[in-house]
Amino acid sequence: MGKWVTIIFVLFLYAIAQQENPAEEVKKQKELLLKEMGILPGDVYAEQGRDMFNKPMGNAGKSCSSCHGQDGRYLRGAYAHMPRYYKDMDAVADLDTRIKYCMEKYMGVGNVKHDLNFKSIATYVATLSNGMKMDVKLTHPKEREMYEKGRELWYARVGKMDFSCAICHDSEAGKRVFLQTVVAVKEDKVATHWPAYRFSNDQLWTMEDRIRGCFGDMRVAPPEHFHWAVVALNLYLSYKAKGGVVRVPGFIY
């Protein structure tokens, strides 16, 4: 009996997936929010991030703007070239990892958490590259090394499901998995619209959150935020998005 209940439930979910159009649902929810609020949630978070960017924090009494100018005027276009190698870190960093490093080393902030305030700052910094083309390069040896690690992780089959990133986003791209359409990483330039607001769970996510979420979807324990594996996959995805126009925060199912 239990077996048949499971089969019927799966078929029911499949039927719903065929009836719903995720793209239309995104459009509908976006229009509804703009009509009711006049602004999208992601843009609200970005504005909050701008305020925090200019606010002193940590033992050094500095703000992000102390180094990068009021409202980050010296960071315009920076996100379009990330992840990248940073000499002061002697490492490749994505947006999240770089912000964490700067907070700890230059601002004296202890115990940096990947919380909503952190993600709001990251989102604001990313908006400073809006309208610019993604142009991640692999000129430094450590950038090339990290990219290769990301590529290896992309194709690695892991977990009880024996799944890989490539199975979904290369082989099965464009197909429906319940209420979502699997995106094609290169063609859809996915890195250009993260950070993003996800209306399905009412949360602001950075690219690190999205990558970690995919580990969970594959029934594999995700690496911690700022882990090299997350940065490596981020670099792989961002390099594949080269030439795409940055438009953040995205509005995602």
From Swiss-Prot:
Signal peptide (UniProt feature, chain positions): 1-17
Catalytic activity: L-cysteinyl-[SoxY protein] + thiosulfate + 2 Fe(III)-[cytochrome c] = S-sulfosulfanyl-L-cysteinyl-[SoxY protein] + 2 Fe(II)-[cytochrome c] + 2 H(+); S-sulfanyl-L-cysteinyl-[SoxY protein] + thiosulfate + 2 Fe(III)-[cytochrome c] = S-(2-sulfodisulfanyl)-L-cysteinyl-[SoxY protein] + 2 Fe(II)-[cytochrome c] + 2 H(+)
Positions that bind substrate: R210
Source organism of the structure: Hydrogenobacter thermophilus (strain DSM 6534 / IAM 12695 / TK-6)
Post-translational modifications: Cysteine persulfide at Cys-214.
UniProt remark on cofactor binding: Binds 2 heme c groups covalently per subunit.
Described function: C-type diheme cytochrome, which is part of the SoxAX cytochrome complex involved in sulfur oxidation. The SoxAX complex catalyzes the formation of a heterodisulfide bond between the conserved cysteine residue on a sulfur carrier SoxYZ complex subunit SoxY and thiosulfate or other inorganic sulfur substrates. This leads to the liberation of two electrons, which may be transferred from the SoxAX complex to another cytochrome c that then channels them into the respiratory electron transport chain. Some electrons may be used for reductive CO(2) fixation.
Protein name (database record): L-cysteine S-thiosulfotransferase subunit SoxA
GO BP annotations listed: sulfur oxidation
Family recorded in the similarity comment: Belongs to the SoxA family.
Gene3D superfamilies reported in the protein's UniProt record: Cytochrome c-like domain
EC number(s) on file: 2.8.5.2
Main location (coarse class): periplasm
Compartment(s) of residence: Periplasm
Protein keywords: Electron transport, Heme, Iron, Metal-binding, Periplasm, Signal, Transferase, Transport
Annotated heme c 1 binding sites: C64, C67, H68, C102
UniProt binding sites for heme c 2: C165, C168, H169, C214
